[in-house]
């Protein structure tokens, strides 16, 4: 196996690891969003005493949404890298 093939395979393996990590981040983000919603509900039920907590819950929800948007963007970029690696692998196979 040539050095180029090893590099492509290693890069592809790393992209799979990154994809799994992005999935984990998405799962945590979803859980965080649910926790923020539950916290907001409880803050609302607490009335005046829960107003400060409602602000914190809203901020946590916003952070979760921001992380979700970043994760989606990274997924798009990672998919593009995988596509290019697939094309490169096919080109290398044809040139051998």
List PLM regions with ranges:
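Parallel, heptad-repeat alpha-helical coiled-coil signal-transduction segments
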Residues: 9-16, 20-31, 44-87
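Short, low-complexity N-terminal regulatory "tails/caps" that precede and couple sensory modules
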Residues: 1-2, 9
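Alpha-helical coiled-coil heptad-repeat segments
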Residues: 1, 92-96
């Amino acid at each position: 196996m040539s050095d180029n093939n090893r590099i492509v395979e290693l890069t592809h393996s790393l992209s799979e690891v990154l994809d799994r990590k992005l999935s984990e981040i998405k799962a945590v983000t979803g859980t965080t969003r649910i926790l923020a919603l539950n916290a907001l509900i409880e803050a609302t039920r607490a009335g005046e005493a829960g107003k400060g907590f409602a602000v914190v819950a809203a901020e946590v929800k916003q952070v979760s949404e921001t992380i979700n948007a970043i994760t989606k963007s990274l997924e798009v970029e990672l998919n593009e890298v995988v596509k290019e690696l697939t094309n490169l692998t096919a080109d290398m196979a044809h040139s051998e």
